Amino acid sequence: MGLNLNPILRQELANLDKDTESRKSAMKALKSYVKDLDSKAIPGFLAQVFETKETNSLSGEYTISLYEILARVHGPNIVPQIDTIMSTIVKTLASSAGSFPLQQACSKVIPAIARYGIDPTTTEDKKRVIIHSLCKPLTDSLLASQESLTSGAALCLKALVDSDNWRFASDEMVNRVCQNVVVALDSNSNQTHLQMGLVMSLAKHNPLIVEAYARLLIHTGLRILGFGVSEGNSQKRLSAVQMLNFLMKCLDPRSIYSEVELIIKEMERCQSDQMAYVRGAAYEAMMTSKRIAAELESKMEKGCRSVTGSNFSRRNCSSIVPDYSLSPESQTLGSFSGYDSPVESSPISHTSCNSEFDRRSVNRKLWRRDENGGVVDISLKDGLFSRVTKGSTTVSDSPLVPYDTCENGDEFEGFLMESLRNTTPSPQRQRSRRINAEDFNIFSTPRKLISSLQYPDDVDLDHSDIQSPILRGEREKTIGSRKNPKLRKQFPTMVETMSSTITVSEDTAQTQMITGKKKKKKMSYAKLVIAISFVVVALFATVILMVNQDDDVGYYTVPT
């Protein structure tokens, strides 16, 4: 039956080049022939169509549409013939001379095969193979030198990407399509709008992969926009603006944030375009870019704000209020170099380390005044030893600095602290000294810490007796004698007596506190015993009363 229909098939294919009525009747007969075609006769049918088809004739798009009908009717049976069909489509696109109806007819065949050629029960690997067999010839055609083939392949790929089964394509294949379409956009062709349409489809369905090419695509779109202005091609300008707007909407704003300002400037220039639809598209893209810029700036500002109780803050966030006007409890120290903070340098004995660290925001610190007029920070949480003055300041870095990563490979020698305010050498004072952990007092209670801040020169004695005025006066005298060596030499006995008196009074106060606590515990125990005894007596009395009432009740005989 197939052999008898071959001459009829040739005749119907020839009628496609005739008038409209002949073409309609020929298409009706060919559709009927395709529906009744046996699956084994599909290869012969494809060969017959390819031999008799003239791609430069008006019947080219009608002939290609037979492949779409074949895919709809026979479904998975057409999968073995995908290579033959794709070869025919590529040759048709190459000889189409930029005919959009022919390119559109080819673009309908590809998603039809992807939809009807894949059986839902097929394994994932086979589905991926089918998508790759459709995609690979078109992807390679994007790099062709013929403009008609490149634009036609882009249109077919766009239809494939927009199909439901494109989700079975592997990331490697999607990445290859992105690479080739970026290269295709570099050539200033008259039909770059088709390649830009493919870019928008990829950004919609595969945004994570397209983000790797985001900046390159932005620059390419701006360059094409410039070509459209110089050439007077409004279609090219419109497509470029639409692609830029679509990329900003679909991709992560962080991947294109560096190019947002450039996009805003170009879109502002497009507001003077002659075409109203170009101005409208440019205005929409400008609003999108401004919204992205505002959102990212607000997020960055929120990230830069210091959070109460937080021990860290973001990099490159400078304080508006001068740091020297703040109290030591509210100052934020940049514990490492390279940040806007009271710290200007970090003079560790080896300064060749290239490590960068996050800025530290220390809210709760232990402070002790230094002999140079500065404030020494003793941080239990961060281990930072820092000196803050109102002038220029040098602060030693944290022991967290990995000195073993230095380039010279020398060992760490310790922390150096020097005040830049002392520019003249003095025999009584060293310009630099080595700081050790023993030089700092860590107080166990807040009361001792407050006392150390009020009496910074008396750090060796206990601060539990500061509340007593008598002991406070004696302490001040003792401190004065310590400060004045002459008084210490003249009255050594008095100083020792005061010290012993303070020690005895401290011991007496502590003993009285312990005795008072013991008395309170004994009183509480006595009260508890009395309460329990009272409850027991009350219960016992209640039971006795109930028993007596039972005894008083008698049994009397009824008189007869």
Curated annotation (Swiss-Prot):
TM segment ranges: 528-548
Name of the featured protein: Protein SINE1
Keywords: Acetylation, Membrane, Nucleus, Transmembrane, Transmembrane helix
Motif (Required for nuclear localization): 557-560
GO terms for biological process, alphabetical: nuclear migration
Membrane topology designation: Single-pass membrane protein
Domain statement: The KASH domain, which contains a transmembrane domain, mediates the nuclear envelope targeting and is involved in the binding to the SUN proteins.
Functional summary from the UniProt entry: Plays a role in nucleus positioning in guard cells.
GO molecular function, one term: actin binding
Domain of life: Eukaryota
Region called ARMADILLO-type fold, residue ranges: 7-287
Residues modified to N-acetylglycine: G2
Domain KASH positions: 517-560
Expression sites (tissue/organ): Preferentially expressed in guards cells, but also detected in root cells.
Primary location class: nucleus
Result of knocking out the encoding gene: No visible phenotype. Affected nucleus positioning in guard cells.
Alphabetical list of Gene3D superfamilies matching this protein: Leucine-rich Repeat Variant
Cellular component aspect of the GO annotation: microtubule; nuclear envelope; nuclear membrane
Quaternary structure and interacting proteins, as annotated: Interacts with SUN1 and SUN2. Binds to F-actin.
Subcellular location: Nucleus membrane
